[in-house]
Amino acid sequence: MKLAPFLIPFIATTVTASLAGEALSWAGQLVGGGRGALATGDGPVRTENSWSYVDCGLATDAIQLKSIKVHPDPPVPGKNLTVTVEGDVLETIEEGAYVDVTVKLGLIKLLQKEFDVCDEARHANASVQCPVQPGPYTVTETVELPQEIPKAKFSVLVRGYTVDDEDMVCLDLFVDFMKK
């Protein structure tokens, strides 16, 4: 599986939905030895028994997240995970927009990589492509989670920036595969 950001700040939502699923997949592969050897900064917007997310962005960010939903809830290793992201794009997202993604297992950094949002949307054949015009977006993506995801707590930190290096989106995703 290629390390394509599917949680990436939602090229206009498709890439965020995709990044959320892929981040879990990446973490499982990195730790499990697989082929690739998760509101405005005041707390979790959504909390389940095994996952939560924090919209750490500002009201002035180009992308405003409304919700992230997963099915099945909680995510199950070895099964498909469908992620639906809703949000508003406040300003046009142009070529050159990028996100920095960090995947951690506890305090251990497993992956830190920068992704070009528009390139990733093209490679993923996403329904939303650059330039992304302002407006509301809902995107659903399905990814296969690896069976070998270890029983551990993962965090996926996403920081997105416009072509002008202005804040675009900020998302922290936390997934706990220790719970049953």
From Swiss-Prot:
SUPFAM superfamilies: E set domains. Residues 21-43 form a propeptide. Residues 1-20 form the signal peptide. GO terms for biological process: intracellular sterol transport; sterol transport. The keyword Signal applies. CDD domains: PG-PI_TP. One of its GO terms (molecular function) is sterol binding. Disulfide bonds: none annotated. The keyword Signal applies. SMART domains: ML (SM00737). Keywords: Lipid transport, Signal, Transport. Coiled coil: none annotated. Monomer. Catalyzes the intermembrane transfer of phosphatidylglycerol and phosphatidylinositol. Belongs to the NPC2 family. This is Phosphatidylglycerol/phosphatidylinositol transfer protein. It comes from Cryptococcus neoformans var. neoformans serotype D (strain JEC21 / ATCC MYA-565). The gene is NPC2.
